[in-house]
């Protein structure tokens, strides 16, 4: 069978899968890739206080955690209680990374600490939600809009106040 053009053995497929997996693992980390930021560290520690030590995953274009090829800044994965930061999509923008970490971290608080009940009331959210975010939130399922809007608002407060709320 080795003479048939394009045919590979199981061994070759296994070796290729192992190489692919090795490359994939290198794109995942519990710390930001090539970025040293005490500010990100402090925010991350607050999230880890809620979810546990290995609760933030930094993905640099990883396929495994759903970042590659999608316009995602990050997400909170309820099933694993895991904040996934799609660092490759941020193009090194620290302010954007911080905003996303606070936003996704707040989703963790909403789920883990508040049982899906918003911290802010509708008037507080409406008064603080920027128009562009209000428009964007309409792309979400109606049941998710209030929590998504709140996470966008909470992400904008200063770090010390955010950490205190978490």
Descriptions of predicted regions:
Residues 1-23:
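N-terminal low-structure segments adjacent to metalloprotease catalytic domains
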Residues 16-31, 78-84:
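Acidic/histidine-rich, surface-exposed loop or edge segments in extracytoplasmic proteins
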Residues 29-35, 86-91, 95-96, 137-141:
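Second-shell loop/turn segments in exported
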Residues 32-55:
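Zn2+-dependent metallopeptidase catalytic core
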Residues 64-95, 111-112:
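Active-site scaffold of zinc-dependent metalloenzymes
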Residues 93-109:
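Short alpha-helix carrying the canonical HExxH Zn2+-binding catalytic motif
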Residues 105-121:
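Catalytic Zn2+-binding segment of zinc metalloproteases
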Residues 118-166:
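Metalloprotease/metallohydrolase-associated module, dominated by Zn2+-dependent proteases
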